[in-house]
Regions:
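Active-site acidic Asp-centered loop
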Residues: 1-3
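Conserved catalytic core of nucleotide-sugar-dependent glycosyltransferases
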Residues: 5-78
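C-terminal catalytic/acceptor-binding lobe
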Residues: 72-164
Length: 164
């Protein structure tokens, strides 16, 4: 869990139910890349909603996965230690384990199923990695672009078939 993530009371149940339907890495903030640049993406889950399970390229804020899959996070050295662990995990799990990444349903009318119910309130202070004074937004997104491009170069298959 990110430090700004408070899940709904049925988030874990939602993840378990989703695992029965589509086994994979689960998370509350799903990202579907449209391009080799991270900023060009669509969202599923927080802060938007999705009525059905959605396959995504990476997830953040609250991961849910089988313990055995943690081995994939360190299978390769990540391109940076400052940023991008979310995409590195999804890329590595896909490459070495054939594991996909999903965002469980986040229906508008059932917030207790959501993976983050206070993200807007808790995730906008100067302590947030994407907002802090040590890392500019430009540097943060440049690093994320680099992470996307490194994974693509190494064979990451994105939902929309993004290429370098």
């Amino acid at each position: 869990f990110d430090d700004d993530t408070i899940p709904g009371s049925k988030w874990f149940e939602n993840c378990l139910d989703t695992m029965e339907e589509k086994e994979g890495i689960m998370g509350t903030a799903g990202v579907i890349l449209d391009d080799k640049y991270y900023v060009r993406h669509q969202r599923a889950g927080w802060p938007t909603q999705n009525a059905k399970v959605t396959e995504v390229d990476l997830v953040g804020h609250a991961w849910f996965f089988k313990r055995d899959w943690l081995q994939y996070l360190w299978r390769e050295k990540p391109p940076t230690w400052r940023n991008g662990e979310d995409m590195h995990f999804s890329y590595s799990a896909q490459k070495y384990g054939g594991i996909k990444t999903y965002c469980p349903p986040h229906p508008t009318e059932f917030r207790e199923l959501h993976g983050s119910i206070m993200g807007n309130e808790l995730g906008i202070d100067d302590k947030a990695t994407s907002n802090n004074n040590e890392t500019s937004h430009q540097q943060f997104f440049t690093e994320r672009d680099f992470c996307v491009q490194e994974a693509l170069r190494k064979g990451w298959q994105t939902v929309r078939g993004v290429k370098l």
